[in-house]
Amino acid sequence: MKLQNTLILIGCLFLMGAMIGDAYSRCQLQGFNCVVRSYGLPTIPCCRGLTCRSYFPGSTYGRCQRY
């Protein structure tokens, strides 16, 4: 019984890691933090259909939201 629980836990962690890794490697999902002005630094863009809206006017950081 203990082995089965351990395998389930490992499976869940692997899936979560894959999902998080996928989100960070390609694009930011809705509600995730993003950078409005990168100043030439490498940043992760928002996913297709989303735009980076700043928290307040002039802010460098924002959150990915639908157009």
From Swiss-Prot:
Residues 1-23 form the signal peptide. One of its GO terms (cellular component) is extracellular region. GO terms for biological process: defense response to bacterium; defense response to fungus; killing of cells of another organism. InterPro entries: Antimicrobial_tachystatin_A (IPR022717). Granular hemocytes, small secretory granules. The record marks F32 as: May be important for binding to chitin. Its main location: secreted. It comes from the Eukaryota. Keywords: Antibiotic, Antimicrobial, Disulfide bond, Fungicide, Ion channel impairing toxin, Knottin, Potassium channel impairing toxin, Secreted, Signal, Toxin, Voltage-gated potassium channel impairing toxin. GO terms for molecular function: potassium channel regulator activity; toxin activity. It is found in: Secreted. Disulfide bonds join C27-C47, C34-C52, C46-C64. Exhibits stronger antimicrobial activity against the Gram-positive bacteria (S.aureus (IC(50)=4.2 ug/ml)) and fungi (C.albicans (IC(50)=3.0 ug/ml) and P.pastoris (IC(50)=0.5 ug/ml)) than Gram-negative bacteria (E.coli (IC(50)=25 ug/ml)). Binds to chitin (8.4 uM are required to obtain 50% of binding). Does not cause hemolysis on sheep erythrocytes. Has no blocking activity on the P-type calcium channel. Has also been shown to weakly inhibit Kv1.2/KCNA2 voltage-gated potassium channels and TRPV1 receptors. The presence of a 'disulfide through disulfide knot' structurally defines this protein as a knottin. This is Tachystatin-A2. It comes from Tachypleus tridentatus.
